[in-house]
Amino acid sequence: IHGLSTAYHLALELQRKGEGDGSDILIIDKTSIAAGASGIACGVVRNNYYQPAMRELMAHSVKVWESDSKAYSYHPVGYMQISPEVMREDVSTIAEQQKDIGYESVFIEGARESHSYMRGLFDDWQAQGITSVLHEKPGGYSNNTQAMYGLADKAEGEGVRILTGATVQEFKRGNGSDAITAVVTDR
């Protein structure tokens, strides 16, 4: 996902600045699109992180997923963290920080309150031992492989070339510097 996303956004930025376009960009993949971790990831799109900097980055990321849900095979169903007492304080901190950055979520505390909230959503709710619910209204899930092909289509739509089934064998450096001037593959 990182390579495809970088190529896509770089192509947009080059065009915006009038310094080129996607045809200046080549992605080399030794196997195929979605063959690595992105193709087997669980596909959850959420903003449930303990690090404040990560939370702001993920809030931005969720907006990107929402920007083209069809291409990214994204389903905006929200995200819930349903927790026992041992996690309540940490989850409360996440909820406070989400509120501070304007990320829409609901935080429910207390065993009775949590059970009631969940019963309001699922009338057959039966789980015991929960004392907090963090319900993120944005977020959801994506069909991972379809999302990667959707992102590849967006990148190619901007002129980015994608070469699959190629192994990088060598980097050529220019003029005695560390600057890479060429990439040698087995194709």
Name each region found by the language model:
Residues 29, 109-110, 164-166:
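Short loop/edge segments at beta-strand edges and connector loops
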